[in-house]
């Protein structure tokens, strides 16, 4: 019997860098959501752990011991076996938590296959800062180094367009370029948004503190943001340390789709582009 788990894209709608610990880890305050765009993990019983990778974004990925999917399997039960397959649809190292989402989906699927309890957030954190929030992919406020997760007020329905200009961004270099690392967090109590225009108006007053150094490293990110805004996005921003950007649209089933197809895929065929809804 095969068990399947979806690994949705993780989007940082806000990302405030609020400090840096003595061990070098940066402190964040981020509003995180997920989209119905993502990778798929399938697991089935086997005597040993194996990993097969396919899909349109599988190029450059290898089933090596340091692959997050295999690390997740070893973390959960190093003595157990399973045949794992990963269908990769999200670009690698693109700021939307693809590897972390894959690891989290692997933990969920293998826990079900092996009849084990899901790992704690503390255990998941050993795989990466984004893995705990991806373990149970619902809208959340992520603070600290990714170890402090909390609920947020209900979000209005919205569709989303994700765009990656196919450039690499060095996350360590982006953090290193930050001149000020002790910035203001979001307000302790988040508002209750009545509708999408009110929510996007609030987002416009928030920040992604990594956007400026990421754009300095890869100026094409600014072109992506401008393309999304010109296409009518109610709000456009960069997720994580880039280079993937997002545009938010009404949940009418056609605005995001038409933007993704007509404006971005035709005007910029070299960019990766996907559309869907925020979960």
From Swiss-Prot:
GO molecular function: 4-(cytidine 5'-diphospho)-2-C-methyl-D-erythritol kinase activity; ATP binding
Top class in the EC scheme: transferase
Reaction(s) the record says it catalyses: 4-CDP-2-C-methyl-D-erythritol + ATP = 4-CDP-2-C-methyl-D-erythritol 2-phosphate + ADP + H(+)
Protein's UniProt keywords contain Phosphoprotein: no
Family: Belongs to the GHMP kinase family. IspE subfamily.
One GO-annotated biological process of the protein: isopentenyl diphosphate biosynthetic process, methylerythritol 4-phosphate pathway
Record gene name: ispE
Native organism: Ruegeria pomeroyi (strain ATCC 700808 / DSM 15171 / DSS-3) (Silicibacter pomeroyi)
EC number annotated for this UniProt entry: 2.7.1.148
Entry keyword annotation includes Hydrolase: no
The protein's role, per its UniProt record: Catalyzes the phosphorylation of the position 2 hydroxy group of 4-diphosphocytidyl-2C-methyl-D-erythritol.
Pathway: Isoprenoid biosynthesis; isopentenyl diphosphate biosynthesis via DXP pathway; isopentenyl diphosphate from 1-deoxy-D-xylulose 5-phosphate: step 3/6
Protein name according to UniProt: 4-diphosphocytidyl-2-C-methyl-D-erythritol kinase
Span of the signal peptide: none
NCBIfam families membership: ispE, PRK14608.1
Keyword terms, alphabetized: ATP-binding, Isoprene biosynthesis, Kinase, Nucleotide-binding, Transferase
HAMAP family hit by this protein: IspE
Cross-referenced InterPro entries: GHMP_kinase_C_dom (IPR013750), GHMP_kinase_C_sf (IPR036554), GHMP_kinase_N_dom (IPR006204), IspE (IPR004424), Ribosomal_Su5_D2-typ_SF (IPR020568), Ribsml_uS5_D2-typ_fold_subgr (IPR014721)
Residues that coordinate or bind ATP: 91-101
List of catalytic residues: 10, 130
